[in-house]
């Protein structure tokens, strides 16, 4: 009987669906394991082989944990709101719902064809009103707690798409050729900064890749510094700056404020006013990326005004430059060009003083010195001296002096900014707020607030979404008076901030999630997805989760206990797969040629899960041959299955089997799937060599392989006479004594150089190891004519002879 993968895979996929094999019960008597994918945006291009890598990894773990007795939650859904569907609607007039349903159907079919063991009864879709009803409910809780507010803010406005971009989205859109400018708009903003300290501190409790945690730390950007007040004698005001280097205050030679600073135009003297206004206008058209790039040429305009340095009484010129941002610190900085490269470049360009206050190994007029390891110089007045102090001591002394003299205060700052939560588009969750004629705001009480039908999906020319054109939806009257609905919609991130909770209780119409079910299933035990979400989805989801924790909706402080980032699978040209490069390998095409089991195994065998690696279609041929070898253990002839025996295995094969169980178990636990597969290949070779038809050996192989290649294992398990599916069979357990090597290879060195090896029984004494090493012919010649100074034996590993000539 031939291995017909297509027939076999269809058969078992139908069996699993008909029998609801992977339906998850909320059984508090069993240990739970929640394994989750970062759910996909269902694009029109479908899934390619690169997308399948993470899904395959989570499915292996889900199947493995079930076989180890865990109650496994392994769900799938769709992050289906988003700009691509709306852009398609603008081009074709097709409603985004139609496009989304079609794309979801395509994605679902591909995932089912791969044999992934999702509990499809828990499927969710962020565009389903029964889902986004609770997204809207969470927003109203944020509003009630003062964590959602409206503000006129400068936003990243994409002219081509007519939509506001989050700071994190700007780079991608510019790279795609879109024009992005800064523009003031009325926006909803979420106060994520209120949770900055907790978002930072709780990272230490998470089993996440260190690089991802560091990316979040950098994004939050906590810094300890000092706010210093500089007197503006001609204006009877103070200009407050924030600095993390108060130890360099004596070296400040000028101040810089942002173009948006409220004093920017007020400080301009008459000769400077026109030039300054033009500069401010041009700066507001630039994105933050354009303004702050390290390679950007420094620009600025002198206001004509001066501020007094509180440390030495010097009058410092006040400049306006676009590299300073209002959104960080106070929107004003003190510049110490001797010890900051950006300040040094600015000072050199505009001929400003450069004053050394940190002892430098070179002339700071020629080269900046930014080191903290040196001592302070030229830093004293009648009240304070920093001369001779290191950074830590100087920081403390200056901060103490500034506070005690009333010239400023210690301050903790964050780079993290509040999250602009509005989008001027149609295809998103409506924000459930009504604006009344008296200026008041009230929440929608009847959720969900759904989207109306529209004739055109183009954003309005005023910057509002297409919802502003639907008057019968927009305006209304209730007991509080006439109102106008909010026309902004939520960003795509909203639905993905909490979806892991809805999988726990997807049909609950009364609550976001049942408390008992939430307490049982949370946290997510393993979350697999791309590292590109480190400071977007992951940070936003952590923020919302902490809000829900404070509200008593969830019982854990963090949503995802363990995070694993899979490496990208590149095209065969070693480039990222994309339509524009023409190197996309559709998942369905490869499955049709080789079968789902071969694709699953090959994806995991390519290399370590976390590494980037190129796809090689020729490589999957080898995996296909391996599966055929597994098949021939049970079906060695064309006619039918071989007769399996219960004759005991010999000692060597028994040990090989237990070593394989041990290796595959440990590697699967640690997501080292490529080496687990390699170990199973070795075991298959041993079975073929021995002509083994032993039932125990075969069933062990199938149980080990089943999480990786479930279809072929189900078929062979049934052929071996088992009635229950292998998906419900327990994982094999190794005997530690039999899993250890009974013979070890001992390396023999002479003066640290390898001169030979020999096989020795496990547990051999040091004396016996040394005696055995002396008998190796290749070693003897290096001992002849030598005096042995020392003999070293490391049990089970090596013998080393330290020698010198007689």
Curated annotation (Swiss-Prot):
NCBIfam families (alphabetical): leuS_bact
EC number: 6.1.1.4
Keywords from the UniProt entry: Aminoacyl-tRNA synthetase, ATP-binding, Cytoplasm, Ligase, Nucleotide-binding, Protein biosynthesis
Motif annotated as 'HIGH' region, chain positions: 40-51
GO molecular function: aminoacyl-tRNA deacylase activity; ATP binding; leucine-tRNA ligase activity
Family under the similarity heading: Belongs to the class-I aminoacyl-tRNA synthetase family.
Protein name, UniProt field: Leucine--tRNA ligase
Motif ('KMSKS' region): 576-580
Keyword Aminoacyl-tRNA synthetase: yes
InterPro entries in the record: aa-tRNA-synth_Ia, Leu-tRNA-ligase, Leu_tRNA-synth_edit, M/V/L/I-tRNA-synth_anticd-bd, Methionyl/Leucyl_tRNA_Synth, Rossmann-like_a/b/a_fold, tRNAsynth_Ia_anticodon-bd, Val/Leu/Ile-tRNA-synth_edit
EC class name: ligase
Catalytic activity: tRNA(Leu) + L-leucine + ATP = L-leucyl-tRNA(Leu) + AMP + diphosphate
């Amino acid at each position: 009987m031939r291995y017909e993968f297509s027939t076999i895979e269809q058969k078992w996929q139908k069996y699993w669906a008909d029998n609801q094999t992977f339906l998850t019960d909320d059984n508090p008597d069993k240990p739970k394991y929640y394994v989750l994918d970062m759910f996909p945006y269902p694009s029109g291009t479908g899934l390619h082989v690169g997308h399948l890598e993470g899904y395959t990894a989570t499915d292996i773990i889900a199947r493995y944990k079930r076989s180890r007795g865990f109650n496994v939650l392994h769900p799938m859904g769709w992050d289906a709101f988003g700009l691509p569907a709306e852009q398609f609607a603008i081009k074709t007039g097709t409603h985004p719902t139609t496009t989304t349903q079609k794309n979801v159907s395509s994605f679902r079919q591909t995932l089912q064809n791969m044999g992934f063991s999702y509990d499809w009864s828990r499927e969710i879709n962020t565009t389903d009103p029964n889902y986004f009803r609770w997204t809207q409910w969470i927003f109203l809780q944020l509003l009630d707690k003062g964590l959602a507010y409206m503000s006129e803010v400068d936003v990243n406005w994409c002219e081509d798409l007519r939509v506001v971009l989050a700071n994190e989205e700007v780079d991608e859109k510019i790279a795609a050729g879109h024009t992005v400018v800064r523009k003031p708009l009325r926006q909803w903003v979420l106060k994520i900064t209120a949770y900055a300290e907790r978002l930072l501190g709780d990272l230490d409790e998470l089993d996440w890749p260190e690089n991802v945690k560091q990316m979040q730390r950098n994004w939050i950007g906590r810094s300890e510094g000092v706010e210093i007040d500089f007197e503006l004698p001609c204006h009877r005001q103070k200009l407050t700056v924030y600095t993390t280097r108060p130890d360099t205050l004596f070296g400040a030679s000028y101040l810089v404020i942002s173009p948006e600073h409220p004093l920017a135009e007020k400080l301009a003297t008459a000769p400077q006013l026109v030039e300054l206004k033009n500069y401010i206008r041009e700066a507001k058209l630039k994105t933050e990326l354009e303004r702050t790039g390290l390679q950007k040429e420094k620009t600025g305009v002198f206001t004509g005004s001066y501020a007094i340095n509180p440390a030495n009484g010097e009058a410092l010129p006040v400049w306006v430059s676009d590299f300073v941002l209002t959104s960080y610190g106070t929107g004003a900085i003190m510049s110490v060009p001797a010890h900051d490269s950006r300040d040094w470049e600015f000072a050199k360009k505009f001929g400003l003083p450069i004053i050394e206050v940190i002892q430098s190994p070179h002339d700071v007029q020629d080269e900046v010195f930014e080191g903290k390891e040196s001592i302070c110089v030229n830093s004293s007045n009648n009240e304070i001296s920093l001369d001779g102090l290191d950074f830590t001591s100087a920081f403390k002394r200056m901060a103490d002096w500034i506070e005690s003299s009333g010239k400023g205060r210690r301050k903790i700052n964050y780079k993290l900014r509040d999250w602009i939560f509005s989008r001027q588009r149609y295809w998103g969750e409506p924000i459930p707020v009504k604006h009344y004629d008296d200026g008041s705001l009230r929440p929608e009480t009847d959720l969900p607030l759904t989207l109306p039908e529209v004739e055109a999906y183009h954003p309005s020319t005023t910057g509002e979404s297409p919802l502003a054109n639907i008057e019968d939806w927009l305006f209304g009257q209730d007991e509080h008076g006439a109102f106008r609905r909010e026309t902004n919609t939520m960003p795509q991130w909203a639905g993905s901030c909490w979806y892991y909770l809805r999988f726990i209780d997807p049909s609950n119409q009364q609550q976001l999630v049942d408390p008992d079910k939430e307490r049982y299933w949370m946290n997510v035990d393993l979350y697999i997805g791309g590292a590109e979400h480190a400071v977007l989805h992951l940070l936003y989801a952590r923020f919302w989760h902490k809000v829900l924790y404070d509200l008593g909706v969830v019982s854990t402080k963090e949503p995802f206990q363990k995070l694993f980032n899979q490496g990208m699978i590149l095209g065969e040209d070693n480039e990222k797969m994309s339509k524009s490069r023409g190197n996309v390998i559709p998942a369905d095409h490869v499955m049709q040629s080789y079968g789902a089991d071969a694709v699953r195994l090959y994806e995991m065998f390519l290399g370590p899960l976390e590494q980037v690696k190129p796809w090689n279609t020729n490589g999957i041929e080898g995996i296909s041959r391996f599966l055929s070898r597994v098949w021939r253990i049970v079906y060695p002839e064309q006619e039918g299955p071989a007769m399996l025996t219960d004759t005991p295995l010999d000692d060597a094969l028994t040990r090989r089997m237990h070593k394989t169980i041990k290796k595959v178990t440990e590697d699967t636990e640690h997501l080292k799937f490529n080496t687990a597969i390699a170990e199973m290949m070795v075991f298959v070779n041993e079975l073929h060599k021995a002509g083994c038809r032993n039932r125990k050996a075969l069933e062990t192989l199938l149980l080990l392989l089943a999480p990786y290649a479930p279809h072929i294992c189900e078929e062979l398990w049934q052929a071996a006479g088992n009635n229950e599916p292998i998906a419900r069979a327990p994982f094999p357990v190794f005997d530690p004594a039999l899993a250890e090597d009974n013979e070890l290879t001992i390396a023999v060195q002479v003066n640290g150089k390898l001169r030979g090896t020999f096989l020795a029984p496990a547990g051999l004494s040091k004396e016996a190891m040394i005696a055995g090493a002396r008998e190796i012919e290749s070693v003897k010649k290096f001992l002849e004519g030598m005096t042995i100074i020392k003999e070293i034996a490391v049990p089970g590993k090596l013998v080393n002879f330290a020698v010198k000539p007689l």
